[in-house]
Amino acid sequence: MSADPTIRRELRPGDLGAIIAHHGRVYGEEYGVDATFEGHVASTVARAANRGFPSPGEAICLVELEGEHVGSLALTDEGNGEAAIRWFVLSAEVRGHGLGRRLLGEVLARAAEVGYTRVWLETFSELEAAAHLYRDYGFEVVSADAAPRWGLERITYQRYELELSKTPASLSA
């Protein structure tokens, strides 16, 4: 990595579109998903945007490298004391330096500070490095569904959950 990435914690016009496009590029190139995956991401982004994301208690982290969007991570309020980790993706050039771990730790600390009792996320099992990171923070797989989707013959969609009341006070795993 030639320069250090910067992290921006506020949305500007165009950022939500960049999150959607970045997911399509990264997961298309690395896992072979088709444009329907972008549609899936777009639907979650649209739901959040239409209700005013980010509201107090939510968070956005936008990662930029030399002015280019190279990653994102969000914490969204899902009601009933629950929050979701959404849109967590980093381009290859910024992986492997602890950035993902740091960002996840920050948003989980924020979730605990705000008073969420549970945090969940949805992903697919083929993202092995991400799964390792989630388990390090205490997330557990609560459901998995292997089926054709996003142009692939078979992909295992998973839901992870973390009960914040069972989490150590320090979320800096």
For the regions a language model picked out, list residue spans one by one.
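Short acidic N-proximal helix/loop "leader" segments that mark the beginning
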Residues: M1-S2
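Acetyl-CoA-dependent GNAT
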Residues: P5-E93, R101-E106, R110, V114, ...
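Conserved catalytic-core motifs of GNAT/GCN5-like acyltransferases
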Residues: G39, W120-T123, E128-A131, R135-R159
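Flexible nucleotide-binding loop
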Residues: H97
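Conserved GNAT acetyl-CoA-binding A-motif
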Residues: A111-T123
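C-terminal end segment of the histidine kinase catalytic
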Residues: P168-A173
